[in-house]
């Protein structure tokens, strides 16, 4: 009897669960960790990239993509599913510019993708998208926005959040480390995102992808040299804080 509920997408289990949606959320929990930080005038997205073969082109393994000049999406979960949502999101952004002659708002494109995900939880012959998305960018009024969508179709806005394998650990870190007066510059937001990823990433296996969006500027991907320099700064600050804490004792 339980297998029937597990295989059926549109049938609730006796305890009120849609098991296929929960299985999709489990696929997200097995994905690479992705973080997002909203600064005063920027948004930073960071992802822990999976290891790839030495023969594979590194540029083809991307966890962060542009939906429009002012919107970027990072994800955790199934890459093939993400490609479909990214394509749909890009087309919707272009269509909105063509029809209304202005850019989409962050809430609009987030709601569009969330509604698409929700439809796939009610249709026979389809399965839910096995990805969770962090959607960040700058609205036309210059305000930075950061949203998080789940496979079920729900979405929320955050100051800082995470998804993927170590999402709970990173969220706990953000709750302790994030404050508006400490994330006033682009550099502050980048360092906080990097600190969050370093909480769950081993230095010897570190492969990070970091994108920055600012008002009036295209999305900028940080190269490996810049990332390494910021990691050193973050590590030094962490050591100094640890020493200061010991001295207080």
From Swiss-Prot:
GO terms for biological process: proteasome-mediated ubiquitin-dependent protein catabolic process. Testis specific. InterPro entries: Ntn_hydrolases_N, Proteasome_alpha, Proteasome_alpha-type, Proteasome_asu_N, Proteasome_sua/b. GO terms for cellular component: cytoplasm; nucleus; proteasome core complex, alpha-subunit complex. Keywords: Cytoplasm, Nucleus, Proteasome. Changing residue 236 to K: In strain: CPA-46. It is found in: Cytoplasm; Nucleus. It comes from the Eukaryota. Pfam families: Proteasome (PF00227), Proteasome_A_N (PF10584). The keyword Nucleus applies. The keyword Chloroplast does not apply. Coiled coil: none annotated. PANTHER family: PROTEASOME SUBUNIT ALPHA/BETA. The proteasome is a multicatalytic proteinase complex which is characterized by its ability to cleave peptides with Arg, Phe, Tyr, Leu, and Glu adjacent to the leaving group at neutral or slightly basic pH. The proteasome has an ATP-dependent proteolytic activity. This is Proteasome subunit alpha type-7-1A. It comes from Drosophila melanogaster. The gene is Prosalpha4T1.
């Amino acid at each position: 009897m339980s297998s029937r509920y597990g295989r059926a997408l549109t049938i609730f289990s006796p305890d009120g669960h849609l098991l296929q949606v929960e299985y999709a959320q489990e696929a997200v929990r097995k994905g690479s960790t992705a973080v997002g930080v909203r600064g005063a005038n920027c948004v930073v997205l960071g992802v822990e990239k999976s290891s790839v073969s030495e023969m594979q082109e590194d540029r083809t393994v991307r966890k962060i993509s542009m939906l429009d000049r002012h919107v970027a999406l990072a994800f955790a979960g199934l890459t093939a599913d993400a490609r479909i949502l990214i394509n749909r999101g890009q087309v919707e952004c272009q269509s909105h510019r063509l029809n209304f002659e202005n850019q989409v708002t962050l809430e609009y494109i987030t709601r569009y993708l969330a509604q698409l995900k929700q439809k796939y939880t009610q249709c026979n012959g389809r399965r839910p998208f096995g990805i969770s998305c962090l959607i960040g960018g700058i609205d036309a009024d210059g305000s930075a926005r950061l949203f998080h969508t789940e496979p079920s179709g729900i979405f929320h806005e955050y100051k800082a959040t995470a998804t993927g394998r170590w999402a709970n650990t990173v969220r706990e870190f953000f709750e302790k480390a994030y404050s508006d007066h400490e994330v006033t510059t682009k550099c502050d937001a980048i360092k906080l995102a990097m600190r969050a990823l370093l909480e769950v990433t081993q230095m010897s296996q570190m492969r990070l992808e970091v994108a920055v969006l600012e008002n009036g500027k295209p999305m900028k991907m940080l190269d490996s040299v810049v990332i390494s320099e910021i990691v050193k700064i973050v590590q030094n600050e962490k050591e100094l804080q640890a020493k200061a804490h010991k001295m207080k004792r």
